[in-house]
Regions:
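Surface-exposed cap/linker segments adjacent to membranes
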Residues: 1-31
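LRR N-terminal entry segment and analogous cap-like coil->beta motifs
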Residues: 37-78, 82
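Leucine-rich repeat
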Residues: 38, 60-65, 84-89, 108-113, ...
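Consensus "Asn ladder" position of solenoid repeat domains
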Residues: 49, 73, 94-97, 118-121, ...
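The feature encodes a structural signal of leucine-rich repeats
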Residues: 55-57, 79-81, 103-105, 124-129, ...
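Right-handed parallel beta-helix
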Residues: 71-119
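Solenoidal tandem-repeat scaffolds enriched in leucines and small polar residues
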Residues: 98-201
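Leucine-rich solenoid repeat scaffolds
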Residues: 247-297
């Protein structure tokens, strides 16, 4: 209880913690939850509050925490080193704040983490390779920050069959070829500065469902790329992709597709769902033609 009261004091006794009365059982307080058997605090989830303060370092003294969230609470400063003491943590949600500094490399020490959400902050620097040390990680959300450099090569070690990677709206420049060994379920690296070829991320034996690489500087020939049948959403708009759309796209049950604003040529393959999309899916290419675009000459 003393740790919780220290946290409350560090947060300037916000109204959302009005139930935190030391005369009552802390397991009945809002924001926290306790294990039914041990009565130890295992959950701290604070949302939708305009606190405008750093994350209290005392949070690291809640050593049995499994879930920790300061979500949309306007937290400031850097992510505190104290979080590295939370060895039981499996869920970390610090999205929608004003956190600064780097993505901490010490997060790679928290081996039970399955989810890291740091989206919508002001984090800078490169993505730490230490995150690949997390054997259970299934979701990594670092979108809407100011991250730079390459996606770490060590991300090829992620083995979770349902891996979700959100890195959009940053300033990343490279996806290493070794990531072709990783089987992403969902990858979004849109609105970065990534160039070159990313076709190695696809393949008929992959299980990728959603892939968004829009608004980058990708340059590769798409003609012979094999897309997996699991693919339902593909967005490649606003790049420098060349070649013809592969016939294999007709065998995929796509829900959404966007290849506009590239340098594609040739006839749009006929069949599957490719003619069910409107012309905006394909427009502003070099010489792409055929339904739903004008007939090829």
């Amino acid at each position: 209880m003393s740790t919780l009261l220290e946290i409350k004091n560090a947060l300037n006794n916000p109204y959302v913690l009005i139930s935190w009365d030391p005369k009552t059982d802390c397991c009945d307080w809002l924001v926290v939850s306790c294990d039914d058997k041990t009565n130890r605090i295992t959950r701290f989830v604070l949302t939708q509050s305009n606190l405008n303060l750093p994350i209290p370092t005392a949070i690291g003294d809640l050593k049995y925490l499994e879930d920790l969230a300061f979500h949309h609470t306007n937290m400031t400063g850097q992510i505190p080193q104290a979080i590295s003491k939370l060895s039981q943590l499996n869920f970390l949600d610090l999205r929608w704040n004003r956190l600064t500094g780097p993505v901490p490399s010490f997060l790679g020490q928290l081996k039970k983490l399955t989810y890291i959400g740091l989206s919508f902050n002001n984090l800078t620097g490169s993505i730490p390779s230490s995150l690949s040390n997390l054997p259970k990680l299934g979701g990594l959300l670092l979108d809407r920050n100011q991250l730079t450099g390459s996606i770490p090569e060590t991300f090829a070690y992620f083995v979770d069959k349902d891996f979700y990677l959100y890195l959009s709206h940053n300033q990343l420049t490279e996806i290493p070829k070794r990531l072709g060994h990783t089987n992403f379920t969902w990858i979004d690296v849109s609105r970065n500065r990534i160039g070159g070829d990313i076709s190695f991320l696809f393949g008929k034996n992959k299980s990728i469902g959603t892939a968004d690489f829009s608004r980058n500087m990708l340059e590769f020939d798409i003609s012979n790329v094999e897309f997996p049948k699991s693919l339902t959403n593909l967005d490649l708009n606003h790049n420098r992709i060349t070649g013809r759309l592969p016939e294999g796209l007709t065998k995929i049950e796509l829900v959404s597709l966007n290849v506009s604003y590239n340098r594609l040529c040739g006839q749009i393959p006929t069949g599957g769902r490719l003619q069910k999309f409107d012309y905006t899916t394909y427009f502003h290419n070099r010489c792409l033609c055929g339904a739903p675009l004008p007939t090829c000459k």
